[in-house]
Structure formats: structure tokens, C-alpha cells
Curated annotation (Swiss-Prot):
Gene Ontology MF, one: neuregulin binding
Extracellular topological intervals: 27-717
Pfam families listed in its UniProt record: EGF_2 (PF07974), EGF_integrin (PF23105), I-EGF_1 (PF18372), Integrin_b_cyt (PF08725), Integrin_B_tail (PF07965), Integrin_beta (PF00362), PSI_integrin (PF17205)
Lineage: Eukaryota, Metazoa, Chordata, Craniata, Vertebrata
Domain PSI, chain residue ranges per copy: 29-75
Keywords attached to this entry: Calcium, Cell adhesion, Cell junction, Cell membrane, Cell projection, Disulfide bond, EGF-like domain, Glycoprotein, Integrin, Magnesium, Membrane, Metal-binding, Phosphoprotein, Postsynaptic cell membrane, Repeat, Signal, Synapse, Transmembrane, Transmembrane helix
Protein name in UniProt: Integrin beta-3
Length: 787
């Protein structure tokens, strides 16, 4: 995460500052330790060099910084200054696929490295790991055949065929085997009364079952999956007396009996352990008088039964972890809900182990195995074997998106074919007695490994030319070595010219750094002008004036330098992975990694191996709890968009695998999976409603159940729209006509009423119609004068 980069820069500056303090502080550490030999000089600090040139001026210190020695005219070929280095001895390229010749498959590179380290120095080297595609897989199914698993036995009778069908999608080279266990066939674990119960433990239940057995190997790993089905069908259950089973005995024998089981060297090894009960552990055998500790060896007899079941105790978790690691076996606990928390605790102590919740009848075991294999293949975790006590290692992981995560030696959320790298710093404390040693770094469950050969460069080349009884050392009172005299016992001085028996008080002023200060810091005797430091039960006193020791550093919780460093003249020199004045602050970050793959859940900073939550409202060991933070629906929505629909900000930033570690399963509809389930709904960019459920089971496995088809609004029906438009136009036209007719009618009625009103008010005079003409007309002749 980008928020960690300032922390990395600060750590780098602190380291550089510490180194600078050694060189340019108030005093030069190389000249203040009072060393008088080349070997002692190299042990003071990685920055110190020794000059064996006899022509070096007498007042010039031979143990000094290299640049100072050159200034003092020391010839370059006479300067002893070994430099720590790393050399790659073998580095085969990483393979891309696992098919073909398995001997040529390489998942770890380089394979061999040689380190040369001088005292208290360190060197960084790199390691790359790739989960190759189509890698061979061996699956050994180890089943509890106690009476309570009777229904489970019938459920797995066709498991071989189904498992092969599913696993063929992941590998073309699969082999499967079968074994069974109950418990030690001895009282008090078995029924011994009535006598018939010995041969038939189900006698009191009016039923028949097999005599009790510890562990039996049934089917050697084979690619003939039908044989698995046939052998399972032949099996019958037995019955034990107490609740815990003897499963750890079976795990141990299935792990160490390579030839019987048929584990291949070049394959992934999966040991599937199924049970519905607790299991006995080391020292439980004493209940039956069995006191002989488990020896971690194969004891399967000719009858394929565990022959030491009644004579050897159950194995311890530590022994089991050691053997599983040696044989590169990944253990899968497929257990029922009632004991899942117990086996979850076991898995935290056994690297490379996963836990799945088994249904009461084992009907889900197929999906459980496939999911567990996917989880195993999605993680790379380094383990270290045979590390010398004087060496300490610190890791930085580069997982996805080339992001460096300090203090981490594992990567999760990977896909098959992904390549991850680790930067490893090896630091030596002091100078080990055994000058050449080796150790191994390997990913858990991988056969491939990196072998690191270490040579501790504690000696000087000039020591090979030492001259015992040299005349230069006062006529043979010492050995002339690397330009100085190494005096024999009883002689002191630069040329071994002074006998310890010659005591002159006038020389005591040379044993005090300043006038008035104690002689030899009151921790030594001044002989011949030199301090001979006292021996101490607490440690070693050194220095020109006996001013230094390796036991006067600060203590934290009762341990010097917190038990994570060495005391060097009052200062703690911390081991790798530790820092601070007390060396009480770890630089590892794996303890801060949350289940979602983020440091402190992305809500805090990792300081000294603990999360300091900075987002308001967040709390928990990894800041995983935050009631006021955006809820799970808001956080998981981006993962659904990325993994299901291949879009969203996580997809654009290529961070899908990094932030989304949950399994996604597509369903037709959401069901009630219990109180640990959260139903979520959101509307996507297409305006569709997406429904999903976030569920985390008791084993810690998180699943996103996503409804396959989002609920999107339906598109418009063209015919309906067309008819609707036409109908609307027709209705509008009819409405317009009706309104127009109504208005006309209203208007006519108003006019008629007005006419009637005016007619009623009108008053007419009687007169002839001026237009009316009678039918006859009378004319008078004005010229007629008759009578």
C-alpha cells in the first residue's frame, strides 16, 4: 500500500543514520576499542579495516576506516577489508507449466547461493517463486471410520470419480489414495466387556461392525479413480469407547510412509483428514500405560496396519509439523461444525494447513477439497530450515502489483502462474566457531528450495604468513602477525618487550584516557602501560582502557536487548527483524496482516508488529472491527463488480486479486445461511439491481454468494407504445371535438336565451306591413267626371 512507503523510507534513513553514527560520530569506533590484532579489528564493525603494512607510521592506528588507512600511506595490498558478498551458484529459470517431465519443473529460483559474511555484517539476496500450471497432484483421503461416520462412508463411495472430474480442470496428472483410522485398540479406548465386544464393538447396540483398529492403509496412490470407489465400498465402520479419535497417529503414518502411500517427489501432496470428533495428542497414551514417545517413523506392517499403535504414544504437534514440512505435505482438516474451532487452532500451529467445515454426511467434501486446494495454491509462504544460531533473517515480500511489503514472508490471493519475489537479508552475529554452514529456504508444500551456503569471513589473509617466535618480537617473545606482535603469555607491549612481572607505577598514566580518571576503568590491571582487563562472570570486558563489555546494555522484560540483539560496548546491536533502543520493536508485519490481505485492514499502521488504528471507530488486533466504517456491503460491492462483472475501480487498477480474497459463488437466488450472513443490494452503472450475500463460516472461509442475473428494468414494448400514442392522439382529437361541440352548444343556448329575452321585452304598434300588397288595387281616374 502506498501509505507504507513513507514508513519504509523512514526505516531506511534510520539504518543509514545508525551506520553513519558508527563512522562519523563523536569517536571512530575502529580506533576506540583497543584492538591489537587483525581478527579483533574485523569483529569491531563491518566498516573497520586493518593495515598489515610494516611501514605504517608508529602513531597511526592499524585498525581504522579504510579511507583513513589510505591517508596514512598504508599500501592498498596490505589492507585487510573483507566485503560481504552473495554469489548465485545455480539459477534454473522458472517453469511455466507442470506437464511433461516433472524432473525439469522449477518453481523456485535461484536454487543455490553462496554467502560470505564478515562479523556483524549482512547481505541481501532475492528469491522468486511461481505456482506453475498443470502441476501433478497426489491426494490421500484419510477417513475416520468410527461409528458416528457411518452415513459419511456411503456419501463418498463415488467420490473418486467426482473428485477426478473436478481436479482434471486444474491438473492433468492426478493420483488418489485412501486410508482409515479409529483409535488405539487398547483399553480404555476400546470396548473390552463383554468379551464379544472385542471382535464386535457394536455388540451392545445389536449391530455388527469391524473390530477396532488404529490406522490401516487401504489404497496406494493411483490414477485409477474407479479403484478408489471400489475400495471405499468395501469399508465398514468400527466403534471406539471415548470421544476423541486416534487421527494424529494416522496422519503421522500417512506422512512418513512414503513408499507405502506412494507420494511422488514432483507433485503437490494433499492429505485430507475427515472426522467429526476431537483427536488424542501426545501424552494421552499414558491413559493406557503407553509411555514410549512417538518416534516419527513408519510402522506400517505387511497387513497395512499401524503396528506400533498399542506400544507408542500419539505424536505431538511439533513432531507432526516437522514431518509434514519434510515431506512437503499440505494437510486439509475437513471437520464438522462442532470441532472446527479446535482444528482451526491446530492449523495455526501447522504451516500449510487449511480447515473446512464438513457437513454431517460428508456430502460437501468434494467442494471442500477443491476449495482447499485452491486456497493452498493461492498462497506462497516461506519456511526456513537448519538456520545457524548466529544468523538472523529478515524478509520483504513483493506480491502483487510489484508492491514491496516489509517484514512479510508470504503472499496470498495469487493465481496459478503468478510470480512473487522475496528480498531476504541475512545478518551474522559475531563470529561463529564453525566457519562454513548452510541452511534452506523453501515455500511450504513445495519440493523446490533454495540452499544457502554461508562462509563466515572472520580471519585475515595475512594470518597465513604469521611468524612464530619472531625476532621482531623482542627476540622471540611473540608471533609476528599482520604487521604487529602477538605476544606470548606473560609478555606485553607493542614489541613484547615488557614482562608482566616488571611492574612500574610510573606507567599507570598510560592506562587512563584522561588525567584523574580511573585506571583501566577500575575493571583491569595496568601492566607495562597496558590494561589487562579482569574476567567477569557476566561476560567479556574489552577496550584499550577496559571501558567496554558485552553485558551492560539496557534490559527489557528481564532480557538484555530484549533477547533480540547483542550488547556491544553499552549499545544494543539488534538482530534482523528488530529495531529500537531496546531491540524490542519488530519490523515484521505478518502479525498486522488482516484476513482481507491488507495491513491493519487498511485502517491503521503497523508499528512494532502491532496495529495502531487511525481510522475513527476502528479497533481489534488488525483494526478489523469498525462499526462506524462503511459496512461489509459497501466494501464487498467493489469485489463483486470486479470479479463478477470485470469492471469497477479495482478492475481498472488491477487490484482485484489483492483486495478481494473471498470466494465467489453464483446462485439462482439467495438463501438463509445463518446469522453470519449479510444480505446486500446495490444498483450498478446499468441501473440494474445486484443482490449478493456475504458469509463467513466458523473456519474463517469467506464467501460471496452473488445472484447470477441482476434485476434490470425491462425495455419498452414498441407495439404498446405505438398503440398508446395512437390511442392518445385519437382521444385528444375526440376530446377536442367534444370540447368544441360543447362550447358551440353553450354559445347557441346563450344566444337563443338572449333572443327569447329580447322578444319578450319587445312592444309592437298595430299597422300594416309596408311590404304587404292586397290582391286588388283601385285606381281613380282623375279625368272622369261622371255622375
Amino acid at each position: 500500500m502506498r501509505t507504507r512507503r513513507p514508513g519504509q523510507l523512514w526505516a531506511t534513513l534510520l539504518a543509514l543514520g545508525a551506520l553513519a553514527g558508527v563512522v562519523v560520530g563523536e569517536s571512530n569506533i575502529c580506533t576506540t576499542r583497543g584492538v591489537n590484532s587483525c581478527q579483533q579489528c574485523l569483529a569491531v564493525s563491518p566498516v573497520c579495516a586493518w593495515c598489515s603494512d610494516e611501514s605504517l607510521p608508529q602513531n597511526s592506528p592499524r585498525c581504522n576506516l579504510k579511507k583513513n588507512l589510505l591517508k596514512d600511506k598504508c599500501s592498498p595490498e596490505s589492507i585487510e577489508f573483507p566485503v560481504s558478498e552473495a554469489q548465485i551458484l545455480e539459477a534454473l529459470p522458472l517453469s511455466s507449466k507442470g506437464s511433461g517431465d516433472s524432473a525439469q519443473i522449477t518453481q523456485v529460483s535461484p536454487q543455490r547461493i553462496a554467502l560470505r559474511l564478515r562479523p556483524d555484517d549482512s547481505k541481501i539476496f532475492s528469491l522468486q517463486v511461481r505456482q506453475v500450471e498443470d502441476y501433478p497432484v497426489d491426494i490421500y483421503y484419510l477417513m475416520d471410520l468410527s461409528f458416528s461416520m457411518k452415513d459419511d462412508l456411503s456419501s463418498i463411495q463415488t467420490l473418486g470419480t467426482k473428485l477426478a472430474s473436478q481436479m482434471r480442470k486444474l491438473t492433468s496428472n492426478l493420483r488418489i489414495g485412501f486410508g482409515a483410522f479409529v483409535d488405539k485398540p487398547v483399553s480404555p479406548y476400546m470396548f473390552i466387556s463383554p468379551p464379544q465386544a472385542i471382535k464386535n464393538p457394536c455388540y451392545t447396540m445389536k449391530s455388527t461392525c469391524l473390530p477396532m483398529f488404529g490406522y490401516k492403509h487401504v489404497l496406494t496412490l493411483t490414477d485409477q479413480v474407479t479403484r478408489f470407489n471400489d475400495e471405499v465400498k468395501k469399508q465398514s465402520v468400527s466403534r471406539n469407547r471415548d470421544a476423541p479419535e486416534g487421527g494424529f497417529d494416522a496422519i503421522m503414518q500417512a506422512t512418513v510412509c512414503d513408499e507405502k502411500i506412494g507420494w511422488r517427489n514432483d507433485a503437490s501432496h494433499l492429505l485430507v483428514f475427515t472426522t467429526d470428533a476431537k483427536t488424542h495428542i501426545a501424552l494421552d497414551g499414558r491413559l493406557a500405560g503407553i509411555v514410549l514417545p512417538n518416534d516419527g517413523r513408519c510402522h506400517i506392517g505387511p497387513d497395512n496396519h499401524y503396528s506400533a499403535s498399542t506400544t507408542m504414544d500419539y505424536p505431538s504437534l511439533g513432531l507432526m509439523t516437522e514431518k509434514l514440512s519434510q515431506k512437503n505435505i499440505n494437510l486439509i482438516f475437513a471437520v464438522t461444525e462442532n470441532v472446527v474451532s479446535l482444528y482451526q487452532n491446530y492449523s495455526e500451529l501447522i504451516p500449510g494447513t487449511t480447515v473446512g467445515v464438513l457437513s454431517d454426511d460428508s456430502s460437501n467434501v468434494l467442494q471442500l477439497i477443491v476449495d482447499a486446494y485452491g486456497k493452498i495454491r493461492s498462497k506462497v509462504e516461506l519456511e526456513v530450515r537448519d538456520l545457524p544460531e548466529e544468523l538472523s533473517l529478515s524478509f520483504n515480500a513483493t506480491c502483487l502489483n510489484n508492491e514491496v511489503i516489509p517484514g512479510l514472508k508470504s503472499c496470498v490471493g495469487l493465481k496459478i502462474g503468478d510470480t512473487v519475489s522475496f528480498s531476504i537479508e541475512a545478518k551474522v552475529r559475531g563470529c561463529p566457531q564453525q566457519k562454513e554452514q548452510s541452511f534452506t529456504i523453501k515455500p511450504v508444500g513445495f519440493k523446490d528450495s533454495l540452499t544457502v551456503q554461508v562462509t563466515f569471513d572472520c580471519d585475515c589473509d595475512c594470518q597465513a604468513f604469521a611468524q612464530p617466535l619472531s625476532p621482531r618480537c623482542n627476540n622471540g617473545n611473540g608471533t609476528f602477525e599482520c604487521g604487529v606482535c602477538r605476544c606470548d603469555q606473560g609478555w606485553l607491549g607493542s614489541m613484547c618487550e615488557c614482562s608482566e612481572e616488571d611492574y612500574r607505577p610510573s606507567q599507570q598514566e598510560e592506562c587512563s584516557p584522561k588525567e584523574g580518571q580511573p585506571i583501566c576503568s577500575q575493571r583491569g590491571e595496568c601492566l607495562c602501560g597496558q590494561c589487562v582487563c579482569h574476567s567477569s562472570d557476566f561476560g567479556k570486558i574489552t577496550g584499550k582502557y577496559c571501558e567496554c563489555d558485552d553485558f551492560s546494555c539496557v534490559r527489557y522484560k528481564g532480557e538484555m536487548c530484549s533477547g533480540h540483539g547483542q550488547c556491544n560496548c553499552g549499545d544494543c546491536v539488534c538482530d534482523s527483524d528488530w529495531t529500537g533502543y531496546y531491540c524490542n520493536c519488530t519490523t515484521r508485519t505478518d502479525t498486522c496482516m488482516s484476513t482481507n490481505g491488507l495491513l491493519c485492514s487498511g485502517r491503521g499502521n503497523c508499528e512494532c508488529g502491532s496495529c495502531v488504528c487511525v481510522q475513527p471507530g476502528s479497533y481489534g488486533d488488525t483494526c478489523e472491527k469498525c462499526p462506524t466504517c462503511p459496512d461489509a456491503c459497501s466494501f464487498k460491492k467493489d469485489c463483486v463488480e470486479c470479479k463478477k462483472f470485470n469492471r469497477g475501480k479495482l478492475h481498472e487498477e488491477n487490484n482485484c486479486n489483492r483486495f478481494c480474497r473471498d470466494d465467489i459463488e453464483l446462485v439462482k437466488e439467495l438463501t438463509d445461511t445463518g446469522k453470519n450472513a449479510v444480505n446486500c443490494t446495490y444498483k450498478n452503472e446499468d441501473d440494474c439491481v445486484v443482490r449478493f450475500q456475504y458469509y463467513e463460516d466458523s473456519s474463517g472461509r469467506a464467501v460471496l454468494y452473488v445472484v447470477e442475473e441482476p434485476e434490470c428494468p425491462k425495455g419498452p414494448d414498441i407495439l404498446v407504445v405505438l398503440l398508446s400514442v395512437m390511442g392518445a392522439i385519437l382521444l385528444i382529437g375526440l376530446a377536442t371535438l367534444l370540447i368544441w361541440k360543447l362550447l358551440i352548444t353553450i354559445h347557441d343556448r346563450k344566444e337563443f336565451a338572449k333572443f327569447e329575452e329580447e322578444r319578450a321585452r319587445a312592444k309592437w304598434d298595430t299597422a300594416n306591413n309596408p311590404l304587404y300588397k292586397e290582391a286588388t288595387s283601385t285606381f281613380t281616374n282623375i279625368t272622369y267626371r261622371g255622375t
